[in-house]
Each structure stands twice: as structure tokens, then as C-alpha cells.
Amino acid sequence: MNTKEIVNKYEFKFNKNLGQNFLIDESVLEDIIEGAEISKEDTVIEIGPGVGTLTKELLERAKEVYSIELDGDLIPILQEELKEYNNFTLIHKDALKIDFNELMENKESIKLVANLPYYVTTPIISRLLTEKCDFKSLTIMIQKEVAERINAEPNCKEYGSLTVLVQYYCNTKIIRKVSPNSFIPRPKVDSIVIKLDRLSEPRVRVKSQKLFFNVVRSSFNMRRKTLWNSLKSLNIDKESMENAFERAGIDPKRRGETLSIEEFGKLSDCIYDIL
């Protein structure tokens, strides 16, 4: 059965508070599966399985699938629809409260697949990356604007701290755009399927990741301000900051959105050296 048929079969009522939008376009489903590159060696962690349409395809291809679902009304539906699969584990919990490192412990070749409610997109991605969860890739359907921020390059309005965070840890690839007509109920925004491939090492080697991300966040907190003004929040004396900018070879009159990840790394290391 397809998604609409399962929804009708169980007379499922969508929960607006959970931002539920179920995928009904099979071509998108196929592109997610193909983009995620799932094999029998892979353990898949799925966030937001809905009624299990994508989950079935994952179960057919993966070694095992762990699906995390918050909505208690979906649990019996998923249990019934997927009862024939012995490589399926259903976790009734809020993904924001999951200990992903514990879940991934002693598992190899972990890939994440998710149709994330828009309100949890950034917190989930940030946790998976900053907590150093051991996954190979993350294939997600997210709001178009967020995907464009993740995939952005310097000198454009989409480029920001989320861009730097994700691209510090991952290569990014947009798989396809998805229209609101591909869901029930129909969302008010366009979506994008994007894949994040985890790098074996961060994109730049820095002396302090904590300082690096502090510099990045401060640089984007007030986008229209120069780096010199934005980084005053670090509470470093004027002479030391002048020295750091000079050693990094970066003009303090530039704005954060003009710096590459490599330049942020160079600047944060020069600040680290003078602290």
C-alpha cells in the first residue's frame, strides 16, 4: 500500500504540532533511496518514519533499520505494517532526546535518513555533527531555505554559521527539489533532499574547535557589521585583535559572509595564539 492508502486504512489524523507532512510522491522516495546509497552492510537510522512507506524500502536494502518516531498514534501503525521484517527496530522517542552515540555503539557503516519536521532540522543536524556521532552519511528532506543555507558558498546571503558548521564536517550535495504537492497535508514551503557525506577529518585543522565556532558565530551574529565590530564580543583587547588579523592576513573591515571556512580557521588559530 502507498502512503495515502495506509493513512486512510487507519484513519490517521495528522498532528500539526509535530509538523507532520507525509511524502506521497514515489519518484521522490526513489531518489531518496538512490541518493542514500543503502546496501546490506549498512545500519540505517531513520528519523520520522511516518506510516513506514520509506521504511519498507530501507528494510529491503539495509542490514538493519532503527526508526525513531515521537507520535504515539503512529507506533501501532508502524508495528502492524512492518511486522514481517526481523531487521526492524522501532524507537518511540523524541529524536532531540536520543543519545545517538549510544544508539550507534558497536555498529558499522551507519547511515541516517530523515524527513525532518522543519522545527527540529537545525538542532538535529547540529547535535549529530558536534557530538561527533559516528555516521557515514545523512540524507534528509528539509525546508528549501535551510538546504540552501547548508549548501551555500561565501559572498551570498544564504552563507552563515550553519553553512560553516555543516561544511566543516561534511561534503554537501543537493539531490533534488521537492514541491509541496508531493506531501499530505500540503506544506506551505518547498523542500529539498540533501545528502551530507561525513568527512574522515574536519575540512580544516584548527587549534581549538570551541574557539573556531565562537569566532564563526560571532562573525554572523550581526551580519551587516564588520569582523572588527562583530568580534568585539570575544572581549579581546584591541592590540591583540589587530595582531591576530594581521597575522591571518585578513582585513578586519570585511564581513563574516565573505570568509571561507579556511579563512575562519586561520583567523581563529591566530586569535588562539595571542590568548
From Swiss-Prot:
The lineage of its organism: Bacteria, Bacillati, Bacillota, Clostridia, Eubacteriales. Pfam families: RrnaAD. S-adenosyl-L-methionine binds at residues 21, 23, 48, 69, 94, 115. GO terms for cellular component: cytosol. This is Ribosomal RNA small subunit methyltransferase A. The gene is rsmA. The keyword Plastid does not apply. It comes from Clostridium botulinum (strain Langeland / NCTC 10281 / Type F). Gene3D superfamilies: Ribosomal RNA adenine dimethylase-like, domain 2, Vaccinia Virus protein VP39. It is found in: Cytoplasm. It comes from the Bacteria. Keywords: Cytoplasm, Methyltransferase, RNA-binding, rRNA processing, S-adenosyl-L-methionine, Transferase. One of its GO terms (molecular function) is RNA binding.
